[in-house]
Amino acid sequence: MPSYVITGASRGLGFEFVRQLSSDPNNTVIGLVRDKVTTEQAVAQELAGRSNIHILQADITDYEAVKDAVTATAQITGGVLDYLVANAAYISEFDAYDSIGVLGNSPKELEEDLFKSFKVNVIANVHLFNLYMPLILAGNIKKVIALSTGMADLDSTNKFELQVAPGYAISKAAMNTAIGKFHAQYKKDGVLFMSISPGVVDTGHYKNATPEQMAKVGGMFQNFVTYNPDFKGPASPEASVKDVISVWENASIEAGSGGSFVSHHGNKKWL
């Protein structure tokens, strides 16, 4: 009976991971969220009757709260964990539509945003992995997955001229390196660490954007089409999560997947 911990499970891709993984009653699915009450209400309304879902409250930047969540997880699973999925992330609105040079005109805000991006997307995940390692090591499957972004790929950044969201991209690139470091340490113990980009997904991130901001997003999408004529726009969370699960299910240390950073296709094709 595989066990999963999903961070950022209250909405978007995180909630979709909970939905898809809990569809198999043999799976134990644990979601870490900042608002337990609201998330449990959503589960009751949309995933009624699934007794294999457990929601724990923990802001991933709160070390003690995550530590308590590990204790609660162990009580649910009997002290083991098969999959740890680091989905929670800080996606800044400050840097979402501008280049790093433009953001440099607001140096204080830029610095604060970079610090927050690094704290949530890198430091919090490093603590998350360290705290859950005893349970992962005791598990059977031993897979740790971090949700990343194609924007963290240097070749992709240059090819698609990806100027926007620099803080998000920089922090995710740092997280990818952390994944490599963890895998280098725990490969000998049979633990697979890897980063997977979910692709371009419609999670409502741009729903409050101004026409000027959407014009910048449209320009980025046009670059995608130029380099990949098959690009039809953002995928649904359902399709993206299905692809990501397929990638980690097919990944193995023996196949060289450990410490890697791949797309939802399992390769370097980001769209």
UniProtKB/Swiss-Prot annotation:
Leading EC class: oxidoreductase
Record's keyword terms, sorted: NADP, Oxidoreductase
Protein's UniProt name: Short chain dehydrogenase virK
Lineage: Eukaryota, Fungi, Dikarya, Ascomycota, Pezizomycotina
GO MF assignments: oxidoreductase activity, acting on the CH-OH group of donors, NAD or NADP as acceptor
Regions crossing the membrane: none
Disulfide bonds: none
Assigned EC number: 1.-.-.-
Active-site residues annotated for this sequence: Y168, K172
Tagged with keyword Flavoprotein: no
Family indicated by similarity: Belongs to the short-chain dehydrogenases/reductases (SDR) family.
Residues involved in NADP(+) binding: L13, D59, N87, Y168, K172, V201, T203
Gene: virK
Job of this protein: Short chain dehydrogenase; part of the gene cluster that mediates the biosynthesis of virensols and trichoxide, fungal natural products that contain or are derived from a salicylaldehyde core. The pathway begins with the synthesis of the reduced chain in virensol C by the highly reducing polyketide synthase virA via condensation of one acetate and 8 malonate units. VirA has interesting programming rules since the first 2 ketides are fully reduced, the 3 following ketides undergo beta-dehydration, and the last 3 ketides are only reduced to beta-hydroxys to yield the trihydroxy portion.
Pathway in which this enzyme or protein is active: Secondary metabolite biosynthesis
Naturally occurring in which organism (per UniProt): Hypocrea virens (strain Gv29-8 / FGSC 10586) (Gliocladium virens)
UniProt xrefs under Pfam families: adh_short
